[in-house]
From Swiss-Prot:
Its EC number is 6.1.1.18. GO terms for biological process: glutaminyl-tRNA aminoacylation; glutamyl-tRNA aminoacylation. GO terms for molecular function: ATP binding; glutamine-tRNA ligase activity. The keyword ATP-binding applies. GO terms for cellular component: cytosol. It comes from Photobacterium profundum (strain SS9). HAMAP family: Gln_tRNA_synth. Coiled coil: none annotated. InterPro entries: aa-tRNA-synth_I_CS (IPR001412), Gln-tRNA-synth (IPR004514), Gln/Glu-tRNA_Ligase (IPR050132), Gln_tRNA_ligase_bac (IPR022861), Glu/Gln-tRNA-synth (IPR000924), Glu/Gln-tRNA-synth_Ib_cat-dom (IPR020058), Glu/Gln-tRNA-synth_Ib_codon-bd (IPR020059), Glu_tRNA_lig_a-bdl (IPR020061). This is Glutamine--tRNA ligase. It catalyses: tRNA(Gln) + L-glutamine + ATP = L-glutaminyl-tRNA(Gln) + AMP + diphosphate.
Length: 555
């Protein structure tokens, strides 16, 4: 049995936390997961969820779920609910009530007034284009706005007008007065408030000025008593603004921000803007399309929460930016389902077999649900005179390497008997329509008594009792490993990312619940689609194949 220290992952953030606790800097750990509710969570967010909530669990601390909801035009209660569901599904609970940055709008306004009174914020009337021009660039310092030296009284009056709805959008903004010559662009008098006449999903029409993320985030952390504010590397420079705000307002708590590398995954995109475009342009069926990297999309495809947590554990937490191969994610779900998914049989491209010497009624066979786990029990599988097999599992002629059914030769049916292909029937186009076979009724669970060798084993489904099913084969959404690098990422969408087949599954699957996973023997891992499947129309999604196919795709 692993000790607690062996069971815990280790990384540089946990080392910082250990040092803070050992030194007495903090008596306990308080983290947070602060998504903006402007889209569905993706697997990159799952990494942050596992990190922040995992730290709170391991250190017996707290982790808040906080919605950084300062942009009402792009946010929606639909996204709030989906995020809550995703966090719970991944196996985590937040501490106390859900937090919203909008809960702090009154206090944030007060802190903005404090900065004005200290001469550290001013109301600017530069247009966005002028502001960009005045800001300079990485090689040239910015120049001060002509409104930078307004008096405190004038700034207070104008900011009050902004709050009261007396100023149109885009005419005025409140900027922090820091350093227009700073080598860090984020410190060149950033905007901290702007006018927006938009209804907010939490506060309604109470406010028409909204704080910017960089101003809101650090103050929300402080108000909630966050000890370790963990975010991705793109916010590394923003830490200077994070610290500046907290250093210049009257607030008790002074959290520290720490950055780690975000998750980049091959053959997909993580940008919410790009993901939203895929949805709004109907290039996918929705945020939960099984080809999407969203948590809901992965869940619908058949990924388990345990497999995603294991993936996040395997890739670790570092400051090194890298791109993870899709095979790494798929290996986690393959390992999970290989151990935990019951087996079943399905035929995706059926051709009929007639067993001519089978003359009795339906024979009910007892088949194991898992070859290595007897506790999963058994199921009843009907064996009938007519069955379906995969079209690719039969050839009229084949070499010795082909271990399936060949005309004039034998093969074993999984969990059933040995059959021999005697003759075939074709249609006018030359396609095989029926394979006529004989069976050895003394080979159920045993080898032929005369010692003849039958090497191949194929799966099958009763033609009389099998259930028609729609089988959705999902592939990578893009044809290139880094679609974000394309001039237009839409042009590299994989036109073959979804193939829909109509096949047959064994009758035991009729009562399978939504999201239930199975290994379709010899094919791959599939799950019951959570939206479209019903008792009248079964729909299964391929989660992953039995073997890694990504190495071949990369060649």
């Amino acid at each position: 049995m692993m000790s607690e220290s062996e069971a815990r992952p280790t990384n540089f953030i946990r080392q910082i936390i250990d040092a803070d606790l050992d030194s007495g800097k903090h008596k306990s750990v308080h983290t947070r997961f602060p998504p903006e509710p402007n889209g569905y969570l993706h697997i990159g967010h799952a990494k942050s969820i596992c990190l922040n909530f995992g730290i709170a669990q391991d250190y017996q601390g707290q982790c808040n779920l906080r919605f950084d909801d300062t942009n009402p035009e792009k946010e929606d209660i639909e996204y709030v609910e989906s995020i809550k569901n995703d966090v719970n599904w991944l196996g985590f609970d937040w501490s106390g009530e859900i937090c919203y940055s909008s809960n702090y709008f009154d206090k944030l306004y007060g802190f903005a007034v404090e900065l004005i009174n200290k001469g550290l914020a001013y109301v600017d009337e530069l247009s966005p284009e002028q502001m960009r021009e005045y800001r300079g660039n990485l090689t040239e310092p910015g120049k001060p706005s002509p409104y930078r030296d307004r008096s405190v009284a004038e700034n207070l009056e104008l900011f009050e007008k902004m709050k009261n709805g007396e100023v149109e959008e885009g005419i005025m903004s409140l900027r922090a007065k820091i350093d227009m010559a700073s080598s860090f662009m984020v410190l060149r008098d950033p905007v901290i408030y702007r006018v927006r006449f938009a209804t907010h999903h939490q506060t309604g029409d109470k406010w028409c000025i909204y704080p910017m993320y960089d101003f809101t985030h650090c103050i929300s952390d402080a108000l909630e008593g966050i000890t370790h504010s963990i975010c991705t590397l793109e916010f590394q420079d923003n830490r200077r603004l994070y610290d500046w705000v907290l250093d210049n307002i009257t607030i008790d708590c002074q959290p520290r921000q720490y950055e780690f590398s975000r998750l980049n995954l091959e053959y997909t995109v993580m940008s919410k803007r790009k993901l939203n475009q895929l949805v709004t342009d109907n290039l996918v069926s929705g945020w939960d399309d099984p080809r999407m990297p969203t948590v809901s999309g992965l869940r619908r495809r058949g990924f388990t929460s345990a497999s995603i947590r294991e993936f996040c554990k395997r890739i670790g937490v570092t400051k090194q930016e890298n791109t993870i191969e899709m095979s790494s994610l798929e290996s986690c779900i393959r390992d999970d389902l290989n151990e935990n998914a019951p087996r079943a049989m399905a035929v995706l491209d059926p051709v009929k077999i007639v067993i001519e010497n089978f003359t009795g009624d339906t024979e009910v066979l007892t088949v194991s649900n898992h070859p290595n786990n007897s506790e999963m029990g058994t199921r009843e599988v009907p064996f009938t005179r007519e069955i379906w097999i995969e079209r690719e599992d039969f050839r009229e002629e084949a070499n010795k390497k082909y271990k399936r059914l060949v005309l004039g030769k034998e093969v074993r049916l999984r969990g059933a008997y040995v059959i021999k292909a005697e003759r075939i029937e074709k249609d006018a186009e030359g396609n095989i329509t029926t394979i006529f076979c004989s069976y050895d009724n003394e080979t159920l669970g045993v080898n032929p008594s005369d010692g003849r060798k039958v090497k191949g084993v194929i799966h099958w489904v009763s033609a009389d009792a099998g259930l028609p099913a729609e089988i959705r084969l999902y592939d990578r959404l893009f044809t290139v490993a880094n679609p974000a690098a394309a001039d237009d990422f839409v042009t590299v969408i994989n036109p073959e990312s979804l193939t829909v087949l109509n096949g047959f599954v064994e009758p035991s699957l009729k009562v399978a619940e939504a999201e239930k996973a199975f290994q379709f023997e010899r094919i791959g891992y599939f799950c019951v689609d959570s939206k479209d499947s019903s008792a009248e129309k079964l729909v299964f999604n391929r989660t992953v194949g039995l073997r890694d196919t990504w190495a071949k795709m990369g060649e």
